[in-house]
A protein has these predicted regions:
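Histidine-acidic metal/acid-base catalytic patches
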Residues: 23-37, 41-42, 48-156
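Active-site acidic/histidine proton-transfer and metal-coordination neighborhood
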Residues: 1-39
């Protein structure tokens, strides 16, 4: 029903593996729609939160990925249970080198957006301290993307 509209504007649509959607479900929808402007939005944190297995999710979704929410997470076990929260790239539990290598090897040319997301547990900070921590994490993450994953423009 909406395909003519996305065709009119030549607008890509990426279906995300969100916190309630497995990679197989995303792929099924994309294959049912079967349109070159419809692909996947791969979220590395959601793959972990769904306990799907990050490597398996990346391998399945990479060939369909038009957009990636590139995140890292820390797993914390405490008396209240098991929790995950976003952190600076390279400081968490996700093998981001493998993720980037898989995307470089398997993703279609339509992959044109890698969105850096850091979902920090800001409730433990004041607003001012939380902003400072977010900026610090973002700067370190950009440095990680540049130095470790070879993302970005050289010489900057």
């Amino acid at each position: 029903k909406n395909l003519p509209l996305i065709e009119e504007y030549n607008m890509k649509v990426a279906i995300e593996n969100h916190c309630d959607l497995w990679s197989d479900e995303v792929i099924w929808m994309i294959e049912q729609i079967d349109h070159p402007l419809v692909g996947a939005c791969l979220d590395t944190m959601n793959a972990q939160n769904m306990m799907e297995g990050i490597a398996s999710c990346i391998d399945k979704m990479a060939p369909y990925t038009y957009c990636c929410h590139f995140c890292d997470t820390k797993i914390i076990v405490d008396p209240d249970g098991v929790h995950s929260y976003g952190c600076t790239l390279g400081e968490g539990s996700i093998d981001l080198i493998r993720v980037m290598n898989t995307l470089r090897r398997e993703a279609p040319p339509e992959l044109d957006t890698i969105d850096l997301e850091i979902e920090m547990p800001l409730s433990m900070y004041t607003l001012e301290v939380g902003r400072e921590e977010e900026i610090k994490a973002m700067r370190k993450s950009i440095q990680y993307l540049h130095d470790v994953l070879d993302v970005g423009i050289r010489g900057r």
